[in-house]
């Protein structure tokens, strides 16, 4: 069974499916549903009046959903309030419906962005997705632009294998490759499930080596969050490329230091380092930090 409602794609899809059927030499029943994948099933998903109390379920679901932000008032978003909050994206709405389409203990493989693994906008989705299903395998791509190298897709993309079950597995397998053309050169890691999926927010931690696993084990031992101990984490107020007119390469009267990640070296702040745009000159309060004690965190790390 395939869902497709794009008239530009349907002829090629039908041709390819018939070709595969012929080449297989086996009896295959092909069913193409030319309908909106979400809106045609939302009554069933939400157990609403008019829905099918016993919809057809599948052993396997494979999907490469559209990556598109939609309005919170879009029909697909309002049809899936259980998983939508804030600024929804079609990809996780499709993934939710894909999991719904599975029979108990069925398996699902989706290629999707990794943005759902954290953040408030995806919390409802994670709660549903990781309660009804359980992650078994996650594949990471190191490159942002080599997975769909013929398309303008710069999302960090992952492939997930999920089983529809309430039984939590002991481990998750995490593999990684540079692109979609070197699957023969995978790095593989087996990680405890409770280390990867953790907390009341169901965050998914995508560790890639044993060092990251050890760091994560230590972090999970913390019993308080930063706000709980009176500490706030925030990004700097000044975005350089949006405020080019106030940037200065050298100190002058009224200049204020502008710190970049390059200024943090071996646990210390080194300033100046003779890089461009190390200073700003402005009277705009919204671009200046108060003169207080700060802990600088170098959050950007190399792949």
Region annotations inferred by a language model:
Residues 3-14, 35-225:
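Signature of N6-adenine DNA methyltransferases within the class I
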Residues 16-25:
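Conserved helix-turn-beta segment of the N-terminal RecA-like "Helicase ATP-binding" lobe
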Residues 22, 150-152, 248-249, 287:
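Generic marker of residues within folded, mature protein domains
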Residues 24-37:
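Conserved SAM-binding strand-loop segment of SAM-dependent methyltransferases
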Residues 26, 131-134, 252:
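Short, structurally constrained coil/turn elements
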Residues 33, 155-158, 255, 293:
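Residues that flank catalytic or metal-binding motifs in active/ligand-binding sites
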Residues 213-303:
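Polybasic, glycine- and aromatic-enriched phosphate-binding surface used to engage nucleic acids
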């Amino acid at each position: 069974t395939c869902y497709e409602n794009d008239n530009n794609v349907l002829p090629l899809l039908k041709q390819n499916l018939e070709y595969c059927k012929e080449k297989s030499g086996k009896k295959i029943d092909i069913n193409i549903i030319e309908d909106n994948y979400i809106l045609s099933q939302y009554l069933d998903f939400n157990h609403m009046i008019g829905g099918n109390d016993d919809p057809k379920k599948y052993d396997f679901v494979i999907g490469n959903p559209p990556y598109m932000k939609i309005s919170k008032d879009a029909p697909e978003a309002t049809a899936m309030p259980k998983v939508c909050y804030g600024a929804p994206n079609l990809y996780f709405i499709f993934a939710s419906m894909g999991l719904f389409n599975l029979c108990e203990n069925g398996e699902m493989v989706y290629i999707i962005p990794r943005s759902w693994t954290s953040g408030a906008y995806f919390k409802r989705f994670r709660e549903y997705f990781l309660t009804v299903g359980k992650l078994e395998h996650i594949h990471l791509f190191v490159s942002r632009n080599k997975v769909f190298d013929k398309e303008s897709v710069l999302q960090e993309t992952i492939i997930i294998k999920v089983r529809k079950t309430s039984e939590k597995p002991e481990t998750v397998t995490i593999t990684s490759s540079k692109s979609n053309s070197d699957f023969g050169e995978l790095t593989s890691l087996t990680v405890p499930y409770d280390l990867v999926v953790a907390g009341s927010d169901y965050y998914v931690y995508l560790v890639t080596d044993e060092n990251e696993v050890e760091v994560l084990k230590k972090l999970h031992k913390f019993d308080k969050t930063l706000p709980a101990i009176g500490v706030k984490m925030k990004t700097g107020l000044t975005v350089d490329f949006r405020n080019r007119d106030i940037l200065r390469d050298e100190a002058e009267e009224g200049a204020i230091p502008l710190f970049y990640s390059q200024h943090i070296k071996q646990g210390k702040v080194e300033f100046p380092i003779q890089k461009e745009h190390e200073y700003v000159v402005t009277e705009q309060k919204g671009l200046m930090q108060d003169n207080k004690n700060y802990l600088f965190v170098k959050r950007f790390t190399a792949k």
